[in-house]
């Protein structure tokens, strides 16, 4: 099944962006080629932009504290797997402590580093990081891969508490939902939400159908419409019945 996810609010949208960027960063920083490490570094700049939103850190701390207060009363409950509960609570408490230790504006260390700032300003220009534009950066790219990787990891480290917090919140949100099998009649599906508030919608479709879900929602109803794309033409609405799995997630 192919999984598509649709955020219902700006906070979850931001966390999904961070997750995608950190996954890309993790992949490219693990590689050996200098060009792949260039992608890792420019991705780190993107992470800093997204994570630098003024209220992100406080939002994450409030949500983690709310989850901690929700889960803590289940300690000692015989109907709850205590080892799993303690693992989650320990992870939340450690991440809260790490967030509390973050000082200053998120990503400020990348701005204050004049050398990185020069790379960042050139990286937004097409072809702007050629060896004649940034000879010192080109020289750094000739260093052994392990040394480059060590440097990039050092620059990323101050942002890791935000990554850990975002991953916990997204994981708890995803685990809150229960998948149901539904059918989009002639490619279209609607469902009343009865005023319930959800943070995330997941749509899983069989890959062999080669359809693409487009979703929208308000506090009363959600819509899923399926389209198909062939080659380089625009996606078009399908008129076949599409079986899929729908999951609504509510922290």
Swiss-Prot record:
Q: Name one GO cellular component term.
A: cell division site
SUPFAM superfamilies, per the entry: YacF-like
Subunit relationships: Interacts with FtsZ.
| Job of this protein | Cell division factor that enhances FtsZ-ring assembly. Directly interacts with FtsZ and promotes bundling of FtsZ protofilaments, with a reduction in FtsZ GTPase activity.
What is the name listed in the Swiss-Prot or TrEMBL entry for this protein?
Cell division protein ZapD
Q: What is its main location?
A: cytoplasm
> What is the native source organism of this protein?
Burkholderia mallei (strain ATCC 23344)
Q: Where in or outside the cell?
A: Cytoplasm
* Keywords from the UniProt entry: Cell cycle, Cell division, Cytoplasm, Septation
Q: What's the gene?
A: zapD
Instruction: Give the family per the record.
Output: Belongs to the ZapD family.
Per its UniProt record, what HAMAP family does this chain match? ZapD
